[in-house]
Amino acid sequence: MAERGGEGGAERGGDRGDFGRGFGGGRGGGRGRDRGPRGRGRRGGRASEETKWVPVTKLGRLVADNKITKLEQIYLHSLPVKEYQIIDHLVGPTLKDEVMKIMPVQKQTRAGQRTRFKAFVVVGDGNGHVGLGVKCSKEVATAIRGAIILAKLSVVPVRRGYWGNKIGKPHTVPCKVTGKCGSVTVRMVPAPRGSGIVAARVPKKVLQFAGIDDVFTSSRGSTKTLGNFVKATFDCLQKTYGFLTPEFWKETRFSRSPYQEHTDFLSTKAVSATKVITEGEDQA
């Protein structure tokens, strides 16, 4: 028995009798040592897959094929933007984002209070385009990521104008505009060049992202509620294109929608995609 435990045990890897050292060292002792970083390799692959955008909607296909090169072409025909990659493709690296606030919100359930996090994110390129996104999620990172996507989907054009003579580039709001959300009311008044943005911290950041250099603002209501404050400012900027001024009184020449203009391109793409599917089914 001693010889069995000594010689056989030594062969099996230790002096623990017949079981050897490590209990199953021959089968799983080197598990995971020579395989490399398992988890990180898969994550890297997912990141590379996410960078490649495969458009799903008609508008996305037109943008990816450079049939549409400006956001104004989308706004002119009031086309709904369903993919945030469209904004990334058209605006590019000039689009910046900032988290305005992250606040915990709670819901009373049978098991107790369920806490989630609500994120407010503003995006803009500083050249007449701004968006606002609000997202609630269990994790802060997920809420911020979702709010950025929603902010890109809600990007709207901001109309800029002059305070006096039309010299140089537009620098302020075209006229007095008012936005409201809840009890908060934000009013913007055109300002002469060089005045700067006279506003509180929250609307000032939104106006900077919108590309407005000079403006006077006044606010009323519970401006302590940051969510309503930033929504009222965004509503105010949306209304800059909500009225007609004398320069828009001219007779409008209507142009065809991009869907009608590039209908051959969209139809051929769809036919080729269906052909590939049917061929794959036939082979199977």
UniProtKB/Swiss-Prot annotation:
Query: Compositional bias (Gly residues) at which positions?
Result: 20-29
Q: Where is the composition biased (Basic and acidic residues)?
A: 1-19
Give the record's keywords alphabetically: Ribonucleoprotein, Ribosomal protein
Q: Which domain of life is it from?
A: Eukaryota
Q: Endoplasmic reticulum among the record's keywords?
A: no
Location of the S5 DRBM domain? 95-158
Q: Which GO terms describe its cellular component?
A: cytosolic small ribosomal subunit; nucleus; plasmodesma
Q: Which InterPro entries match?
A: Ribosomal_Su5_D2-typ_SF (IPR020568), Ribosomal_uS5 (IPR000851), Ribosomal_uS5_C (IPR005324), Ribosomal_uS5_euk/arc (IPR005711), Ribosomal_uS5_N (IPR013810), Ribosomal_uS5_N_CS (IPR018192), Ribsml_uS5_D2-typ_fold_subgr (IPR014721)
Q: What is this protein's record name?
A: Small ribosomal subunit protein uS5z
Organism of origin is Arabidopsis thaliana (Mouse-ear cress)
User: Top-down, what is the taxonomic lineage of the species of origin?
Assistant: Eukaryota, Viridiplantae, Streptophyta, Embryophyta, Tracheophyta
